[in-house]
Amino acid sequence: MRTSVATVCLSGGLVEKLHACASAGFDGVEIMDADLVGAYESPEEIRTLCERLGLTIDMFQPFRDVEGVDEQTFADNLRRADAKFDVMERLGTDLMLLCSNVGTATIDDDDLAAEQLGRLADLAAARGIRIAYEALAWGRYVDDYRRAWRIVEKADRPNLGVCLDSFHILSRGHDPAEIETIPGDKIFFLQLADAPALDMDVLQWSRHHRLFPGEGDFDLTGFLGHVLRAGYTGPLSLEVFNDTFRQTAVFRTAAHARRSLTWLADRTEDAGRVPDAERLDRKSVV
C-alpha cells in the first residue's frame, strides 16, 4: 500500500516539509491549508515541486462546519467550498477532507445533514472533486464514524465517502469492528495516529498529544485490520498533532514517522489481521 503524511506533523515551512517527506520515502502528502497559506510559493509551484519530488497530493484539508445549518448559512458554505475547489484545482488534487460540524448552532438532523452534503457533493462533482466526511471526536452531534457513514449513505453520492481517523474513533472508545460494514470503496481516506491514555479534554488531547504508531496505547494493529478487511485500498496516512514533533528537526521527524508505518504494517501482518499479505506492498513500507 502507498504511504502518506499530513504536513501538519512536521516543523518548518511547506517546501522544507515536502523535501523531508520525499527524503523519508513517503509516496504522498496531505496538505494543510494553513501550510499552503503560509507558503511563499503559489499552489502551482507547490504542485510542480511535489511532482518533481515524486509526491502525490493525496488530500487537501480541512474544510469545516458545513452541514446541519440554516439555508442562508449553507449558501455561504457553498461559496466557501467553491473557493476551496479553486485552490484544489491549482494544486492538482481531487480529495477534500470535510470535518463534522462543531458549531453550537448546528441542527441535529441527519436528513438535513445528508441533503446538504449531497448538494455539496454535487457542486464538487462538477469540478471532478471527491469529499471525505470525517466524524470529529468533538463534533457537535456527529462524533461517531458510524453516524458519519449513515449520513453519507443517506446522501448517496458517488463522490462522497468517509475519512476514518484512528484517534477520533479510538479516543472515544467506539468499536472499530463495525468499520467492516462500510464498503471499501466508500472509505475515501485513512488517517492514523497513536496516543497515550490520558484523562483530559479530547480536543486538547488530539491537538497536542498524538503520537506515531507504536508510541501510545491505542490498538492500531486491530484498527488497521478492520479497515483493510473492509476493502480499503488507499494510502496509509499519518495525521499526528504533537507540539514536540512540530519543533524538532523536520528530516529526522519525517524519517521517524515513516519508520512507524513500517512497524505498523509489520505488526498488522504478523498478527494475521490482513486478509491478503500481498495487499501490503513491501516496497512501500520499508
Q: Where are the predicted features?
A:
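Short catalytic-loop micro-motif centered on adjacent basic/acidic residues
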Residues: 4-7, 30-31, 132-135, 163-165
